[in-house]
Amino acid sequence: MELLGQKVKEDGVVIDEKILKVDGFLNHQIDAKLMNEVGRTFYEQFKDKGITKILTIEASGIAPAIMAALHFDVPCLFAKKAKPSTLTDGYYETSIHSFTKNKTSTVIVSKEFLSEEDTVLIIDDFLANGDASLGLYDIAQQANAKTAGIGIVVEKSFQNGHQRLEEAGLTVSSLCKVASLEGNKVTLVVEE
């Protein structure tokens, strides 16, 4: 997705050779028009897969996920990082390690909102080592829901997340692939 790649190159801030900050349009302040295009692109890629729910994790995955849900005309369901007092019935849970925050969180999804009747598209803002997407896939499997694929806004292709997801048998669609952050510069993967 050319517009997204341009935004990543122009507005992304390289913190170090493994961390890219995109707070100006994705992770803190959200460019709604860009996220609408992200959602539309995921819809075009997965529209024939029978998607019944978009599944993501709070917080940064919500913006692209809700825009995808809007285009699919299905609910957006996000895994919570803390169990609210209002969640009194059953839930699915898994542990997810955040590469950026270097922190492991237990995330939960209410059994009320995810079941074997669902076909989910998992959406996440970043793909580094794949732990968040694999954790969401684990939750979908616990619910006996079908996973149609994984939609990633920005993939750090120099890390092993994409490979791990494919090894799990998942279809992965990354809209912007970063080849390198070396030399304090964003270099994108050139698609042929």
UniProtKB/Swiss-Prot annotation:
Provide the residue positions that the database annotates as binding xanthine: L20, N27, K156
Per the record, what are the reactions this protein catalyses? XMP + diphosphate = xanthine + 5-phospho-alpha-D-ribose 1-diphosphate
Query: Which Cys pairs does UniProt list as disulfide-bonded?
Result: none
Q: Biological process GO annotation list?
A: purine ribonucleoside salvage; xanthine metabolic process; XMP salvage
Q: Name one GO cellular component term.
A: cytoplasm
SUPFAM superfamilies, per the entry:
PRTase-like (SSF53271)
Q: Which Gene3D superfamilies match?
A: 3.40.50.2020
Q: Where in the cell is it found?
A: Cytoplasm
Enzyme Commission no = 2.4.2.22
The GO terms describing molecular function are: xanthine phosphoribosyltransferase activity
Q: In which pathway does it act?
A: Purine metabolism; XMP biosynthesis via salvage pathway; XMP from xanthine: step 1/1
Residue numbers binding 5-phospho-alpha-D-ribose 1-diphosphate: A128, N129, G130, D131, A132
Primary place of residence?
cytoplasm
The Swiss-Prot or TrEMBL record describes its family as follows:
Belongs to the purine/pyrimidine phosphoribosyltransferase family. Xpt subfamily.
Q: How does it assemble?
A: Homodimer.
Q: What does this protein do?
A: Converts the preformed base xanthine, a product of nucleic acid breakdown, to xanthosine 5'-monophosphate (XMP), so it can be reused for RNA or DNA synthesis.
Under the heading PANTHER family, the entry gives: HYPOXANTHINE/GUANINE PHOSPHORIBOSYLTRANSFERASE, XANTHINE PHOSPHORIBOSYLTRANSFERASE
Under which name does UniProt file this protein? Xanthine phosphoribosyltransferase
What is this organism's lineage?
Bacteria, Bacillati, Bacillota, Bacilli, Bacillales
